[in-house]
């Protein structure tokens, strides 16, 4: 049986990267929450 997690940096960044978050209103809310919480990393992208 094939494992469900098949890592790809490109897919990861397109779904969860900084620019993907900034592209939508809700994504920007995610970043705002994470900034307010004091997260060291806002998104998975470098």
From Swiss-Prot:
GO cellular component: cytoplasm; cytosolic large ribosomal subunit
Residue stretches in coiled coil: none
Intrachain S-S bonds: none
Pfam families hit by this protein: Ribosomal_L34
PROSITE patterns according to UniProt: RIBOSOMAL_L34
GO molecular function, one term: structural constituent of ribosome
Source superkingdom: Bacteria
GO biological process: cytoplasmic translation
Keyword terms: Ribonucleoprotein, Ribosomal protein
Family of the protein in this entry: Belongs to the bacterial ribosomal protein bL34 family.
The protein's assembly and partners: Part of the 50S ribosomal subunit.
Protein name: Large ribosomal subunit protein bL34
């Amino acid at each position: 049986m094939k494992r469900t997690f098949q890592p790809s940096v490109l897919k990861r960044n397109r779904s969860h990267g900084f620019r993907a978050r900034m592209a939508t209103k809700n994504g920007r809310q995610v970043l705002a929450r994470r900034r307010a919480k004091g997260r060291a990393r806002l998104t998975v992208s470098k």
